[in-house]
Every structure is written in structure tokens, then in C-alpha cells.
């Protein structure tokens, strides 16, 4: 490699199954690896002698299944007990162990047992992509723009940034995959000043995003985004693998579930069959000596493949409906529907999408495997001042956060500070106060999600604001300041206004227990469960009203001047009603109606008592 440092920043699409790298030098170039392939498998293999990354790792996977690691993107930024992690562990041939609540990958390397974090495995893939670029450019690469699914949460974004740092890269920006693809499409389509609504449908190997953008000239504004960080080509392969596994068992009586090598060979054949069925209507899967000397041969038609995956294919339309709803536009107002990600080559996926948009012609003008890296390279050139042509010089990218951010208030009620689909970077403020007299510490638990009840959302982290001057409840003014940077990474600061005391947290190591089901359904659940959310909010509101009224009655009854004016019988009745109200407050199961009735009964007793003075 020649001396010197590359002044620009490369663009890396770090994919679940394949990765791609691009550079910008007056125009974007997708860089092929040493095998001449423009995409590189996101695989890392460990042997007694060496470590292999990319094609070399994937090619030996069947011979060394337990030490060949893939799908690191499905682990990154997730907790070990995440539902999707637990489900994936069952199908992976490599071992995943738990350490401090985080998943680690255990392999045999250089004849020793070693463990690696998902960030480390991802950093190895990033290093490979960096080396591919350096071989082409002839200079050392230090800066990169790395892409993530739009629906990645705070923990997953931060972990990806960390992987870049481990790979020796200064990650200038984390950008969303569909937004990067939109840049590739928007520039390729020729810059038009006419306003266009463009829907990016990005179905890759392991993740799925839908983003709706408004493109006007060089300004790309994301209006809404939705998706599933655990849906892609891998899942279609898995369903096909299950189908053939049963077929093999029916034919031979052999169950290959516990044979990692047989499973890897069958998965590779399934991936090949899936690709064949995108162009042909049927294909044959043939594997010599799959298990116990038994050969396996089976035919599969496109129709059968579509049937096996019909539920997953149909589920891709839910985020499409969601973004249209969030962006408040009808499907007829969408000017272009752009396909991104290798899995959009599947004819059935295309047909469902086209039918949804009333037979609309889908945009296939950009390469679905390369568009994301292309857009990342353009962004890299802009951030390093290397963009030379007019198209890219004036380009402005306005992205959004995928899920609301906020804090838990008394009663575990979620108080959103930054609503979902807010353009980033952003700073939002919200004022809070104390709930008890002379309270000197307030805890700020920070959540991400769409539900009223915080337990239904993801806890990202928590911090305390201490040394608040002791005052009556409700008097201190505490301001929570949420700053989301252009990477979508959050910093929260709380300030007590009278003293200027502050505490803050950068949510860099989020607790990250967002299960796939929660991510997938968070927004649709918020609608489906709106009634229970409303009931939760109403109950909390009534409880607060009762608590406030009880406190005022207690102060009246205990005030020597006021209580002396009450007849004993009236005072007894008020105290009895007060006791009932306190009991209602103590019962966990009390409903909003129970609190309302208790408040009414207490009000009656007080009104009567005061009238008989």
C-alpha cells in the first residue's frame, strides 16, 4: 500500500449476511474484493491456524460450522435474554454464552477457547471492508460512514459505532440504510426541483426497513420510518430449511437437527434454491451424503416456496401502511416505490407491494445490493469536503428517530420528550417537578417506545439528579433536556433551575432488552392496546386527583382551628370517609372508577360536615 492517508471517508453497508464498501472520487465506485465480488459475506471463521473473513470464511463453513460466525448484526446491541437472541441461538451452529447480561460468541481459535462480543465480530467484518478499500485506493483509510437499519434502537447504533472504533475507523456518521439508498436513487434519477414522495422498501438478509422521504432538489427529508430489525432473507431460508429437514426425515427417518455440518450444507442449498426461484419457477436441491451416508434430492416450485413463506411476505406490508399513516399521505400520493436489499428480488414480494400500490410499477433502477453503500460513500464525501460535483455539494439529509424517547413519571407513566419521527439532530426539553415534600433526589429512568405504561417500553438507562434544595412537592423546576445527535444517539441532561445543578447520561450502554416482537409490534400495539393504555392513563389521573384531595382534607381535619369548628359526629364521618379513601389508594387493583367513587364519598362527607358546623 502506498504511503499517505485517504482524505475522504469510505461508505460501508454492514449487512447481516453480506457487506459492501464504496468510495467517492469525483464519482462513486463500489469496490470489489480480492475474489472480484462487489459484496462480501459478513462471515468470520476461526481455525487452529488462522482467522478468515468474508468469502474464505463462508466457503469453509460446512467443514467448520461451530467456529464460523455469522449474523452478528442480529446480536449487536441486544441483551442475552432478548427473545430474538434466544430464538436465534437454537438455530446457530456456533455457541453463544452470557456475560453480564450480554451475549458473547464462543469459538476454538489457535487451539484455545476464546469469546468475542458481537461488536468485535462486526469490527472484523468492518476491518475486512476497510482493507478492500485500501487495496483499491492505495492509501490508508481512517474515516467511514457506516449504515444501520432505520429501526435500530439507541443501543444497537452505539454498539455499531463501537465496532467501527474497534476496527480502527473514525465513524463520522451512522446513517440509516433506507436513507442512504434514497441518496443513491435521488442522485441517480437526475436532480429535479420537483417535489417527490419516495417510498424506500429495504428488505435485506436480516433486517427490514420502510422509509418515506420527501425529495425536493438536493433536500432529502425523511417523513416517517418503520420496520423490523429481525426479518429478511435468512428467515426465508430458515423456513425452506425446516421444510426440507422434514422431507429428509420422512424419506430416511433421520433427523439432522443436531448435526451442524448437515444443517450448514442444507442452508447453503436453500439459499441457492431461493435465488434460483427468483428467475425460474422450479429448482432441485441435491446434496450428496447429507447425513449418515444418505443423499438428499428434492424438487421445489416457486409456488411452494411462496406458500412456505406467505405469512412473512404478507407481514412486509404492515410497515408500509404504518409509514403512510405516520406521514399522513395516501398511497396514491407516493410518486415512486424503490426496491433495496437482495430479498426484494423475490417475485412474490414485488407482486404484493405492486398490488398494494394498485399495480404501480416498482423502481428497480438502482442495484439493490449496492445502493446503501453508494449513499454512504456520498455522505462520506460531503462530511469530509470531498464532494466535487453540484449534485452532491448541495445535498442535505434530514433523518428521523424511529421510536419516541422520554422518561418515566410517577405511576410509571411514560412522558415522551422526543416524539417518534422527529427530525435529527434535535434538542427537546420538558419540565418536571418533585412528588414529595423536601425531596432532594429525583430519578430519571429513560425509555424508548410508544406505550403509556413504561413497562411496555425499553429501558435505555437511568440517572439521579441529586442535591435538589428541599422544598414543598411541586415547587422545584426540573428540566429534562434530550439531545439526539445526527447518528440517532441520545444524551439526556436534567437541570434543577434554581441552583443550576445538573446530571446527565449518554445512553451508550443501553440495557437493550427490546425483544423482536416488541420492536415489530410497538407502534401497531400502541394502537391495538390504545384502550388499555387509555385506561392506564385515566386510572393514574383519577388516583392523583384522589391523592391530592385526601391530602387537602387531612390538612383540614388536623388543623386545630378548623377542626374545632366541626361537630364530633361530622368529624367522625369525614375521618371514616378519609379512611375508606386511603384504603382504596392502597389496593393495587383499584380502578379509575373506584378512585372516582372514593373521592365523591369523601366530598359528600366533607360538604355535609361543613354545612352542620
Curated annotation (Swiss-Prot):
A GO CC annotation given for this chain: cytoplasm
Subcellular location: Cytoplasm
A GO BP entry: translation
Residue span of region Lid domain (SBDalpha): 516-612
Gene Ontology molecular function, alphabetical: ATP binding; ATP hydrolysis activity; ATP-dependent protein folding chaperone
Binding site for ATP: 16-18, 73, 205-207, 271-278, 342
Motif Nuclear export signal boundaries: 574-582
Pfam families: HSP70
E.C. numbers: 3.6.4.10
Positions of region (Nucleotide binding domain (NBD)): 1-391
Catalytic activity: ATP + H2O = ADP + phosphate + H(+)
Region (Inter-domain linker): 392-402
Main location group: cytoplasm
InterPro entries for the chain: ATPase_NBD, Heat_shock_70_CS, HSP70_C_sf, HSP70_peptide-bd_sf, Hsp_70_fam
Sequence segments annotated as region (Substrate binding domain (SBD)): 403-613
Keywords tagged on the record: ATP-binding, Chaperone, Cytoplasm, Hydrolase, Nucleotide-binding, Protein biosynthesis
Record's function text: Ribosome-bound, Hsp70-type chaperone that assists in the cotranslational folding of newly synthesized proteins in the cytosol. Stimulates folding by interacting with nascent chains, binding to short, largely hydrophobic sequences exposed by unfolded proteins, thereby stabilizing longer, more slowly translated, and aggregation-prone nascent polypeptides and domains that cannot fold stably until fully synthesized. The Hsp70-protein substrate interaction depends on ATP-binding and on allosteric regulation between the NBD and the SBD.
NCBIfam families with a match to the protein in the record: PRK00290.1 (NF001413)
Oligomer status and interactors: Binds to ribosomes. Binds close to the ribosomal tunnel exit via contacts with both ribosomal proteins and rRNA. Directly interacts with nascent polypeptides. This interaction is dependent on the ribosome-associated complex (RAC). Interacts with SSE1. Interacts with FES1.
PANTHER family: HEAT SHOCK PROTEIN 70KDA (PTHR19375)
Family: Belongs to the heat shock protein 70 family. Ssb-type Hsp70 subfamily.
Protein name stated in the entry: Ribosome-associated molecular chaperone SSB1
Native source organism of the sequence: Candida albicans (strain WO-1) (Yeast)
Gene behind the chain: SSB1
Amino acid at each position: 500500500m502506498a504511503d499517505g492517508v485517504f482524505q475522504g471517508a469510505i461508505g460501508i453497508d454492514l449487512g447481516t449476511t453480506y457487506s459492501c464498501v464504496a468510495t467517492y472520487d469525483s464519482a462513486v465506485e463500489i469496490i470489489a474484493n480480492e475474489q472480484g465480488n462487489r459484496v462480501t459475506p459478513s462471515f468470520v471463521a476461526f481455525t487452529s491456524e488462522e482467522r478468515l473473513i468474508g468469502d474464505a470464511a463462508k466457503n469453509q463453513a460446512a467443514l467448520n460450522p461451530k467456529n464460523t460466525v455469522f449474523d452478528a448484526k442480529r446480536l449487536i446491541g441486544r441483551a442475552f435474554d432478548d427473545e430474538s437472541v434466544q430464538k436465534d441461538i437454537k438455530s446457530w451452529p456456533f455457541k453463544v454464552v452470557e456475560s453480564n447480561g450480554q451475549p458473547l460468541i464462543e469459538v476454538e481459535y489457535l487451539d484455545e477457547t476464546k469469546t468475542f462480543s458481537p461488536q468485535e465480530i462486526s469490527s472484523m467484518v468492518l476491518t475486512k471492508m476497510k482493507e478492500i478499500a485500501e487495496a483499491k485506493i492505495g492509501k490508508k483509510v481512517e474515516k467511514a460512514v457506516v449504515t444501520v437499519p432505520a429501526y435500530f434502537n439507541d443501543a444497537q447504533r452505539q454498539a455499531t459505532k463501537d465496532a467501527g472504533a474497534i476496527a480502527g475507523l473514525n465513524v463520522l456518521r451512522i446513517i440509516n440504510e433506507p436513507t442512504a439508498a434514497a441518496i443513491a436513487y435521488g442522485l441517480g434519477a437526475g436532480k429535479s426541483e420537483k417535489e417527490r414522495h419516495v417510498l424506500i422498501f429495504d428488505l435485506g438478509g436480516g433486517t427490514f426497513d420502510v422509509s418515506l422521504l420527501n425529495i425536493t432538489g438536493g433536500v432529502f427529508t425523511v417523513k416517517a420510518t418503520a420496520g423490523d430489525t429481525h426479518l429478511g432473507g435468512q428467515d426465508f431460508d430458515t423456513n425452506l430449511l425446516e421444510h426440507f429437514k422434514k422431507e429428509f426425515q420422512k424419506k430416511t427417518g433421520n433427523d439432522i437437527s443436531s448435526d451442524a455440518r448437515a444443517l450448514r450444507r442444507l442452508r447453503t442449498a436453500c439459499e441457492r434454491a431461493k435465488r434460483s426461484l427468483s428467475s425460474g419457477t422450479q429448482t432441485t436441491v441435491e446434496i450428496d451424503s447429507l447425513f449418515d451416508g444418505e443423499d438428499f434430492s428434492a424438487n421445489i416450485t416457486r409456488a411452494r416456496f411462496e406458500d412456505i413463506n406467505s405469512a412473512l411476505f404478507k407481514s412486509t406490508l404492515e410497515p408500509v401502511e404504518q409509514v403512510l399513516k405516520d406521514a399522513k399521505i395516501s398511497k396514491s400520493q407516493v410518486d415512486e416505490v424503490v426496491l433495496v436489499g437482495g430479498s426484494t428480488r423475490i417475485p412474490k414480494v414485488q407482486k404484493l407491494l405492486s398490488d398494494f400500490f394498485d399495480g404501480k410499477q416498482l423502481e428497480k433502477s438502482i442495484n439493490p445490493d449496492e445502493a446503501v453503500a453508494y449513499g454512504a460513500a456520498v455522505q462520506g464525501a460531503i462530511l469530509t469536503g470531498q464532494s466535487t460535483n453540484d449534485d452532491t455539494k448541495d445535498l442535505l439529509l434530514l433523518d428521523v428517530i424511529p421510536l419516541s424517547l422520554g422518561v418515566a413519571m410517577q405511576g410509571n407513566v411514560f412522558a415522551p420528550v422526543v416524539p417518534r419521527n422527529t427530525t435529527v439532530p434535535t434538542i427537546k426539553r420538558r419540565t418536571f417537578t418533585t412528588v414529595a415534600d423536601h425531596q432532594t433526589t429525583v430519578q430519571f429512568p429513560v425509555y424508548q417506545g410508544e406505550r403509556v405504561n413504561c413497562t411496555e417500553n425499553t429501558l435505555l438507562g437511568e440517572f439521579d439528579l441529586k442535591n435538589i434544595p428541599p422544598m414543598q412537592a411541586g415547587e422545584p423546576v426540573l428540566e429534562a433536556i434530550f439531545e439526539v445527535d445526527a447518528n440517532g444517539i441520545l444524551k439526556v441532561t436534567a437541570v434543577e433551575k434554581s441552583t443550576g445543578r445538573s446530571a446527565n447520561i449518554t445512553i451508550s450502554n443501553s440495557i437493550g432488552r427490546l425483544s423482536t416482537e416488541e420492536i415489530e409490534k410497538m407502534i401497531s400495539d400502541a394502537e391495538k392496546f390504545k384502550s388499555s393504555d387509555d385506561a392506564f392513563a385515566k386510572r393514574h389521573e383519577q388516583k392523583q386527583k384522589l391523592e391530592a384531595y385526601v391530602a387537602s382534607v387531612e390538612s383540614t381535619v388536623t388543623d386545630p382551628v378548623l377542626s374545632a369548628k366541626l361537630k364530633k359526629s361530622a368529624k367522625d364521618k369525614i375521618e371514616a370517609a378519609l379512611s375508606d379513601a386511603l384504603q382504596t389508594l392502597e389496593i393495587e387493583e383499584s380502578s379509575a372508577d373506584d378512585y372516582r367513587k372514593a373521592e365523591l364519598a369523601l366530598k359528600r362527607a366533607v360538604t355535609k360536615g361543613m354545612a352542620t358546623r
